[in-house]
Amino acid sequence: MHYNKLLIYTYIEKFDASFITSLPKKISLIYRNYEKTNINEILKIYKLCKKVKRKIFISNNIKLAIKLNADGAYIPSFNNDLNIKYFKFKKNFELIGSAHTYKEIQIKKLQNIDKIFLSPIFENEKKKKNLGIYRFLHLKKYAKREVICLGGIKKQNLKKIKMIEPAGFASISLFR
Protein backbone atom coordinates (compact mmCIF):
# COMPACT_ATOMS: atom_id res chain seq x y z
CA MET A 1 0.00 0.00 0.00
CA HIS A 2 1.34 3.38 -0.96
CA TYR A 3 0.61 6.62 0.87
CA ASN A 4 -0.73 8.11 -2.33
CA LYS A 5 -3.54 5.53 -2.30
CA LEU A 6 -4.66 6.51 1.20
CA LEU A 7 -7.54 8.91 1.72
CA ILE A 8 -6.28 11.84 3.77
CA TYR A 9 -8.33 14.31 5.80
CA THR A 10 -7.64 17.27 8.04
CA TYR A 11 -9.87 19.53 10.08
CA ILE A 12 -10.37 23.27 9.82
CA GLU A 13 -12.23 25.57 12.24
CA LYS A 14 -11.94 28.89 10.43
CA PHE A 15 -11.16 30.30 7.02
CA ASP A 16 -7.43 30.27 6.29
CA ALA A 17 -6.75 30.65 2.57
CA SER A 18 -3.00 30.08 2.83
CA PHE A 19 -3.51 26.84 4.79
CA ILE A 20 -6.18 25.54 2.40
CA THR A 21 -4.14 26.29 -0.73
CA SER A 22 -0.84 25.02 0.72
CA LEU A 23 -2.15 21.51 1.39
CA PRO A 24 -1.49 18.79 -1.18
CA LYS A 25 -4.50 18.46 -3.52
CA LYS A 26 -5.38 14.98 -2.28
CA ILE A 27 -6.22 16.11 1.26
CA SER A 28 -9.93 16.57 2.01
CA LEU A 29 -11.10 19.17 4.53
CA ILE A 30 -13.60 18.71 7.31
CA TYR A 31 -15.04 21.98 8.60
CA ARG A 32 -15.57 21.46 12.34
CA ASN A 33 -16.38 24.30 14.70
CA TYR A 34 -18.74 23.34 17.51
CA GLU A 35 -18.51 26.69 19.30
CA LYS A 36 -20.09 28.80 16.58
CA THR A 37 -21.62 28.26 13.15
CA ASN A 38 -20.56 31.13 10.94
CA ILE A 39 -22.23 30.67 7.57
CA ASN A 40 -20.08 33.33 5.88
CA GLU A 41 -16.93 31.58 7.11
CA ILE A 42 -18.20 28.22 5.86
CA LEU A 43 -19.11 29.73 2.49
CA LYS A 44 -15.61 31.17 2.05
CA ILE A 45 -14.06 27.79 2.89
CA TYR A 46 -16.48 25.99 0.58
CA LYS A 47 -15.86 28.35 -2.37
CA LEU A 48 -12.09 28.13 -2.03
CA CYS A 49 -12.21 24.32 -1.76
CA LYS A 50 -14.27 24.13 -4.94
CA LYS A 51 -11.91 26.55 -6.69
CA VAL A 52 -8.83 24.44 -5.84
CA LYS A 53 -10.73 21.15 -6.40
CA ARG A 54 -10.52 19.99 -2.78
CA LYS A 55 -13.24 17.89 -1.14
CA ILE A 56 -15.07 19.60 1.71
CA PHE A 57 -17.16 17.98 4.44
CA ILE A 58 -19.33 19.86 6.93
CA SER A 59 -19.33 18.51 10.47
CA ASN A 60 -22.59 17.70 12.25
CA ASN A 61 -24.83 19.72 9.90
CA ILE A 62 -26.22 17.55 7.12
CA LYS A 63 -28.80 20.12 6.02
CA LEU A 64 -26.09 22.73 5.47
CA ALA A 65 -23.84 20.21 3.69
CA ILE A 66 -26.70 19.34 1.32
CA LYS A 67 -27.64 23.00 0.80
CA LEU A 68 -24.03 23.95 -0.05
CA ASN A 69 -23.65 20.92 -2.30
CA ALA A 70 -20.64 19.87 -0.21
CA ASP A 71 -18.96 16.54 -0.87
CA GLY A 72 -20.45 15.16 2.30
CA ALA A 73 -21.08 15.47 6.01
CA TYR A 74 -19.00 14.36 8.99
CA ILE A 75 -21.05 12.87 11.83
CA PRO A 76 -19.15 12.98 15.15
CA SER A 77 -19.25 10.13 17.64
CA PHE A 78 -21.58 12.03 19.99
CA ASN A 79 -24.26 12.33 17.28
CA ASN A 80 -26.52 9.29 17.75
CA ASP A 81 -29.40 10.49 15.56
CA LEU A 82 -30.65 7.54 13.51
CA ASN A 83 -32.83 9.77 11.30
CA ILE A 84 -29.71 10.72 9.33
CA LYS A 85 -30.26 7.80 6.98
CA TYR A 86 -33.58 9.28 5.82
CA PHE A 87 -32.10 12.38 4.20
CA LYS A 88 -32.08 12.57 0.40
CA PHE A 89 -28.50 12.78 -0.82
CA LYS A 90 -27.03 13.51 -4.23
CA LYS A 91 -25.29 10.59 -5.93
CA ASN A 92 -21.72 11.15 -4.67
CA PHE A 93 -22.57 12.64 -1.27
CA GLU A 94 -20.56 10.85 1.44
CA LEU A 95 -21.42 10.37 5.07
CA ILE A 96 -18.32 9.98 7.19
CA GLY A 97 -18.21 9.78 10.96
CA SER A 98 -16.13 9.02 14.02
CA ALA A 99 -16.34 6.26 16.60
CA HIS A 100 -14.29 5.07 19.56
CA THR A 101 -16.12 1.92 20.71
CA TYR A 102 -18.10 -1.06 19.41
CA LYS A 103 -21.34 0.66 20.44
CA GLU A 104 -20.47 3.83 18.52
CA ILE A 105 -19.50 1.77 15.46
CA GLN A 106 -22.89 0.06 15.60
CA ILE A 107 -24.60 3.46 15.68
CA LYS A 108 -22.55 4.65 12.69
CA LYS A 109 -23.61 1.52 10.79
CA LEU A 110 -27.26 2.24 11.59
CA GLN A 111 -26.74 5.82 10.36
CA ASN A 112 -25.43 4.41 7.04
CA ILE A 113 -22.04 6.07 7.45
CA ASP A 114 -19.77 5.28 4.48
CA LYS A 115 -16.40 5.69 6.21
CA ILE A 116 -15.73 5.39 9.93
CA PHE A 117 -12.93 7.35 11.59
CA LEU A 118 -11.61 5.27 14.51
CA SER A 119 -9.87 7.23 17.20
CA PRO A 120 -7.61 7.81 18.88
CA ILE A 121 -5.26 5.25 17.38
CA PHE A 122 -2.18 6.80 19.02
CA GLU A 123 -1.63 8.84 22.16
CA ASN A 124 -2.06 12.57 21.65
CA GLU A 125 -2.13 15.76 23.69
CA LYS A 126 -5.89 15.61 24.27
CA LYS A 127 -6.18 11.90 25.02
CA LYS A 128 -3.49 9.84 26.70
CA LYS A 129 -5.63 6.70 26.40
CA ASN A 130 -5.64 5.34 22.86
CA LEU A 131 -6.86 2.33 20.94
CA GLY A 132 -3.45 1.06 19.96
CA ILE A 133 -2.81 -1.12 16.93
CA TYR A 134 -4.49 -4.35 18.12
CA ARG A 135 -7.71 -2.77 19.38
CA PHE A 136 -7.83 -0.65 16.22
CA LEU A 137 -7.58 -3.81 14.08
CA HIS A 138 -10.41 -5.47 16.07
CA LEU A 139 -12.65 -2.42 15.65
CA LYS A 140 -11.71 -2.17 11.96
CA LYS A 141 -12.79 -5.76 11.38
CA TYR A 142 -16.07 -5.16 13.22
CA ALA A 143 -16.81 -1.94 11.31
CA LYS A 144 -17.19 -3.66 7.92
CA ARG A 145 -16.78 -0.25 6.32
CA GLU A 146 -13.81 1.72 5.06
CA VAL A 147 -11.92 2.80 8.17
CA ILE A 148 -9.87 5.96 8.63
CA CYS A 149 -7.22 6.26 11.39
CA LEU A 150 -7.53 9.33 13.57
CA GLY A 151 -5.71 10.63 16.62
CA GLY A 152 -2.06 11.21 17.45
CA ILE A 153 -0.85 10.75 13.89
CA LYS A 154 2.64 12.12 13.39
CA LYS A 155 5.42 11.58 10.85
CA GLN A 156 7.10 8.98 13.09
CA ASN A 157 4.04 6.69 13.15
CA LEU A 158 3.07 6.85 9.46
CA LYS A 159 4.83 3.51 8.87
CA LYS A 160 2.58 1.88 11.50
CA ILE A 161 -0.45 3.23 9.67
CA LYS A 162 0.80 1.74 6.43
CA MET A 163 1.10 -1.68 8.16
CA ILE A 164 -2.52 -1.78 9.38
CA GLU A 165 -3.91 -0.95 5.92
CA PRO A 166 -6.67 1.54 6.66
CA ALA A 167 -8.55 3.31 3.87
CA GLY A 168 -6.82 6.47 5.05
CA PHE A 169 -5.98 8.73 7.95
CA ALA A 170 -6.95 12.09 9.38
CA SER A 171 -4.71 14.43 11.28
CA ILE A 172 -4.62 17.98 12.50
CA SER A 173 -1.09 18.29 13.87
CA LEU A 174 0.61 16.60 10.90
CA PHE A 175 -0.45 19.44 8.59
CA ARG A 176 0.00 22.42 10.92
Which sequence ranges carry the predicted segments?
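Catalytic phosphate/metal-binding cores of nucleic-acid and nucleotide-processing enzymes, i.e., regions
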Residues: 1
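Hydrophobic faces of well-ordered beta-strands that scaffold small-molecule active sites
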Residues: 4-10, 27-31, 56-58, 73-75, ...
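Short, acidic/polar
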Residues: 10-23, 60-63, 100-107, 154-159
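N-terminal active-site wall of soluble small-molecule enzyme domains
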Residues: 17, 21-24, 28-88
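Structural motif
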Residues: 23-26, 68, 111, 142, ...
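Alpha-helix-loop-beta-strand connector modules within alpha/beta enzyme cores
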Residues: 42-58, 80, 85-101, 129-154
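Glycine/Thr-rich beta-alpha phosphate-binding loop at enzyme active sites
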Residues: 67-79, 93-138
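Glycine-rich phosphate-binding active-site loops on the catalytic face of alpha/beta enzymes
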Residues: 73-87, 117-130, 152-176
